[in-house]
Amino acid sequence: MVFISHYDSPLGGITLASDGEALTGLWFDGQKHYGSTLGRDCQEKDLPVFVETRQWLDIYFSGWEPDFTPPMRMEGTPFQKAVWEILRTIPYGGTMTYGEIAAKLCEGYSDGPGPGAGARPGPTRRMSAQAVGGAVGHNPISIIVPCHRVVGAGGSLTGYAAGPEKKKQLLSLEYPAP
C-alpha cells in the first residue's frame, strides 16, 4: 500500500508518498516522472513520516538548512542509488556538475567501496554525464535528495524535472543573491 499526502509550498503543490514507514516520493505537482513510485492503490493518510517531512519542508522554505532528514526509502537500480547517494553529499547552497558526479562514480568503481561500488561490475575509467543525468532526473525524492543542486558544465541550470524556473528558485532560496 502506498500512502500519500500533500504540501503547499511557496513554489506550488508537492505530493508526498510513503510505504507507511519511510518517505518514498516527493514531487512538485505535474513535474516530469511525477508519482513514479505510486501504484494504483494509493490512500491519503497523515503518517508520522509526513508530519516530519512537512516540518523539514517548512524549515527549508523558510530559508534555513534543516538539521534532520526524514526516513527515506528509494527504489531504483544500483546505478541510480549510487548517483542519489552522491546527490545527498552536495552541501546546502552548493552545486555539483553532472561531470563531477560521473567522476565521483568512477572513483567509487575503481577504488572499491564507495558510492559507486557494486553499481556495475569491474573498474571503469569513464562515466557518461548523460547517464548521470538520467539517474538524477529519476530521483523520486526531490528537494531532500537535492537534484536541483546539479548543474551543467559552466554552471548552466539544465535538467530539472520540475523545470528550470523551480530549480532557479530553489537555488536562490539556498544561496540568496547579495
What kind of region is each of these model predictions?
Residues M1-T24:
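DNA-contacting interfaces and partner/effector-binding or oligomerization modules
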Residues F3-P10, W64-P178:
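Nucleic acid-binding interface residues in structured DNA/RNA-binding domains
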Residues G12, F28-Q31, E75:
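Histidine- and/or cysteine-centered catalytic micro-motif in compact active-site loops
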